[in-house]
Amino acid sequence: MKVKNKKILAVYLVVFIFFMLITKIDFRTVEPQPYHSHDDASYYFHAYTLGIDFDLDYSNQLSENNRFYTTNNLISKPVPTHPIGSGVLSAPFIFFGNIIENLFFNDSNLRVIYFFYSMSAIFYFFISGYLLNKTFKNLGYKSISELNILYLLVGSGLPYFAFERFGTTHVYEVFGIS
């Protein structure tokens, strides 16, 4: 590996470790309930039903008389009101979290599925930085370094949504345009 690539990898590793140190892990093992914050719960239920049930039937996650969710008149079942996009991107993490939870933590109250769900936003945050770097290099912007892209991402406030409000769509939107 080139020396420059090793330095870039070292910078990304240090930044990743820094963000992992400031990430609050304690609340990540409690799944949102239908009465929790509407945004976070809505996106989580999209991802959960795709990653675990492999369908779009929310009846096993939501009650029909919940005030945060609409009822689809065609099927008379509750449906989260937020778009499904981030749920599609984070569903593979829930799927693998479910496998890990069933293999190793079957009798525990620890919710590994929700922890894996929270890691999806962090994964897409760092992949977005990598893709933006590649895009700028391919477009011929040689003066924009990897560190500048990291400054742009961190300065935009995106780490807050990746590490604290991981259920919202901000990180997934940046990934989509990277």
What are these regions (language model features)?
Residues F19-V30, G157-R165:
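Transmembrane-helix signature of polytopic, lipid-linked glycan biosynthesis machinery
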Residues L21, P92, F96, I100, ...:
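Hydrophobic membrane-targeting alpha-helices
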Residues H82, F93, V112-F123, Y151, ...:
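Membrane-embedded glycan-lipid processing machinery
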Residues N102-R111, I127-S156, F175:
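Transmembrane-helix signature of polytopic, membrane-embedded enzymes
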Residues Y172-S178:
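Specific aromatic-rich, kink-prone transmembrane helix
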